[in-house]
From Swiss-Prot:
Organism of derivation: Pseudarthrobacter chlorophenolicus (strain ATCC 700700 / DSM 12829 / CIP 107037 / JCM 12360 / KCTC 9906 / NCIMB 13794 / A6)
GO molecular function: magnesium ion binding; mannonate dehydratase activity
InterPro entries the record matches: D-mannonate_dehydratase-like, D-mannonate_dehydratase_GalD, DgoD-like, Enolase-like_C_sf, Enolase-like_N, Enolase_C-like, Mandel_Rmase/mucon_lact_enz_CS, Mandelate_racemase_C
Cleaved signal peptide residues: none
Stored SUPFAM superfamilies: Enolase C-terminal domain-like (SSF51604), Enolase N-terminal domain-like (SSF54826)
Name this polypeptide is given: D-galactonate dehydratase family member Achl_0790
Family: Belongs to the mandelate racemase/muconate lactonizing enzyme family. GalD subfamily.
Length: 409
């Protein structure tokens, strides 16, 4: 069996997605996700101009060899554009292998290690009453674990707090990327955030009790001392994790944070390779791996990093907002179902328009996800539907402090 075509599609059903479709001489197709929020066309061009032609004539079953070829042969390694492109190829090849075998991908990874995958949802609010309403809504939807993000007095817009209204009767989760030719500027005040956040978790615990696992995302905005202070202040509220508390580039910061708090730590949604995790896993500076299949090179390296993490009792907490397409999301569900050290899966529901383009076998019931038992990844791409939603330029926002200094968003 040989590959005869590799086609790239950019579509925007509610948001932009980059999809790779690989076709074999036997007519078997596989799809992969190469979406990089705010930089979609960069990955699409990389795939079209530098990768697609290299796949023609290759054996689709040689997944590891193809992965290593794409990673090493260009000499220029790592980085979000390169790794998203490689991820799409890797997913598509696993999809083909599963279809040829007549099995879902998780069976090829060793079979299921559990019956379902615990998921968490995103609750947010401009104030405490609206936050409570959002928590209740997510509990009614079946979520058993909730991420808590809230507005901060004195700050106009805060990451993780939905600003847009619902439209056409459709429920939307938080979408930070703004359509347009330039990113939106937001303001930030870390001291105000640190003063306010513990009282939010106190209020949520008083309202909903001690049993619900609660999570929070710091989004890389704190110094090590600030993160340590926050982790300590949140200890009475028994968080499931504090995510991305310090900038991802400064991994040594986690040593200081770890020394000062027992609040569990998660990081890695902007990591691209297992090498980014080497030190923090070996030194047990984190509790959860936040990598995403789409930005990490695909299914193959995601499974590898989790096998490495298992030696240190570190679990998965894969990145899963709606800027991961249904293809990329399903890919990491297969990994999560197969590995022993699964922790939790972030899950934001895609829009109805997105579901017109990507037909999924995935299910969500009573707080648990399952990738389904269709052969391959379990997602089919509707090219005709995708054509009805052309690309729209979009950017993630950026932060400035009160004095005008650019700050981590």
């Amino acid at each position: 069996m040989k590959i005869i075509a590799a086609d790239v599609f950019v579509t925007s059903p509610s948001r932009n997605f980059v999809t790779l479709r690989i076709t074999t001489e036997d007519g078997v197709t596989g799809i992969g996700d190469a979406t990089l929020n705010g930089r979609e066309l960069a990955v699409a061009a990389y795939l079209k101009e530098h990768v697609a032609q290299l796949l023609i004539g290759k054996d689709p079953h040689r997944i590891e060899d193809t992965w290593q070829f794409l990673y090493r042969s260009s000499y220029w390694r790592r980085g979000p554009v390169t790794m998203a492109a490689i991820a799409a190829v890797d997913m598509a090849l696993w999809d083909i292998k599963g279809k040829v075998a007549g099995m879902p991908v998780y069976q090829l990874l060793g079979g299921a290690s559990r019956n379902g995958l615990r998921a968490y949802g995103h609750a947010s609010g401009a104030d405490i009453p609206s936050l409570f309403d959002s928590v209740r809504e997510h509990l009614e939807l079946g979520y058993k674990s909730i991420r808590i993000q809230t507005a901060v007095p004195g700050i106009k817009a805060v990451y993780g707090v939905a600003a847009q209204a619902q439209a056409s009767g459709e429920r939307y989760d938080y979408e930070p990327a703004g359509r347009g030719a330039f990113p939106v500027e937001e303001d930030w005040d870390t001291r105000a955030y640190l003063r306010h956040l513990p009282s939010v978790f106190e209020a949520v615990r008083n309202e909903f009790g001690p049993e619900i696992p609660l999570l929070h995302d710091g989004h890389h905005r704190m110094t090590p001392i600030q993160a340590a202070k926050l982790g300590k202040a949140l200890e009475p509220y028994d968080l499931f994790w504090l995510e991305d508390c310090t900038p991802a580039e400064n991994q040594e910061a986690l040593r200081l944070v770890r020394q000062h708090t027992t609040t569990p730590l998660a990081i890695g949604e902007i990591f691209n390779t297992v090498y980014d995790y080497q030190t923090i896993i070996k030194e047990q500076l984190i509790d959860y791996v936040r990598a995403a299949s789409t930005h990490f090179g695909g299914i193959s390296p995601l499974k590898k990093v989790m096998d490495f993490a298992a030696q240190y009792q570190i679990k998965s907490g894969f990145h899963g907002p709606t800027d991961i397409s249904p293809v990329g999301f399903a890919a990491q569900l297969h990994v999560g179902l197969a590995i022993h050290n699964y922790g939790i899966q972030e899950y934001m529901q895609h829009s109805d328009k997105t579901n017109e383009v990507f037909h999924q076998s995935m299910t969500f019931k009573d707080g648990y996800l399952h990738p389904g038992d269709e052969p391959g990844i379990g997602v089919e791409f509707n090219e005709e539907a995708a054509a009805a939603f052309p690309y729209q330029q979009a950017y993630l926002p950026y932060n400035r402090l009160v004095d005008g200094t650019v700050h981590d968003w």
